[in-house]
Curated annotation (Swiss-Prot):
PANTHER family per the UniProt record, alphabetical: 60S RIBOSOMAL PROTEIN L12 (PTHR11661), LARGE RIBOSOMAL SUBUNIT PROTEIN UL11M (PTHR11661:SF1)
HAMAP family: Ribosomal_uL11
Any Pfam family matching the protein: Ribosomal_L11_N
SUPFAM superfamilies recorded: Ribosomal L11/L12e N-terminal domain (SSF54747), Ribosomal protein L11, C-terminal domain (SSF46906)
Protein name per Swiss-Prot or TrEMBL: Large ribosomal subunit protein uL11
Species lineage: Bacteria, Pseudomonadati, Thermodesulfobacteriota, Desulfobulbia, Desulfobulbales
Family affiliation: Belongs to the universal ribosomal protein uL11 family.
Source organism of the structure: Desulfotalea psychrophila (strain LSv54 / DSM 12343)
GO molecular function, one term: structural constituent of ribosome
InterPro entries for this protein: Ribosomal_uL11, Ribosomal_uL11_bac-typ, Ribosomal_uL11_C, Ribosomal_uL11_C_sf, Ribosomal_uL11_N, Ribosomal_uL11_N_sf
GO cellular component, one term: cytosolic large ribosomal subunit
Gene that produces this protein: rplK
Post-translational modification: One or more lysine residues are methylated.
Cited SMART domains: RL11 (SM00649)
Keyword Hydrolase annotated: no
Complex formation: Part of the ribosomal stalk of the 50S ribosomal subunit. Interacts with L10 and the large rRNA to form the base of the stalk. L10 forms an elongated spine to which L12 dimers bind in a sequential fashion forming a multimeric L10(L12)X complex.
Amino acid sequence: MAKKAMAYIKLQIPAGKANPSPPVGPALGQHGVNIMEFCKGFNARTQSMGDTIVPVVITVYQDRSFSFITKTPPAAVLLMKAANITKGSSNPKSERVAEISKEKIREIAEIKMPDLNAYDIDAAMLIIEGTARSAGITVVE
């Protein structure tokens, strides 16, 4: 018989830097999960990713065991890293903070492809371009 899922916890944690302090500790502790076991597993799986923020979905089962799936970094984080900026525009319609090329958009779309709801790379590029527009980043040819 399959284990019955009790809760799903979604977190965004820097790669290789999960520790029991907030937000990880309280989120897992309220469901009775072994926090250190998660931290060790997450850090081992993501240590090669550098300093990127990694979304993770943790499934907690009724017997207090858990499994987790790491996703690709958020598109906004990848865009800001590619454009060498720390923060997006506070008013993206009128204030542009950076420019990014179509080639960089394609690279980011290829990285994000497993997590995007798109069938081909062109559709994925349109999604990433929309995210760039929302952050105040101009896409140039």
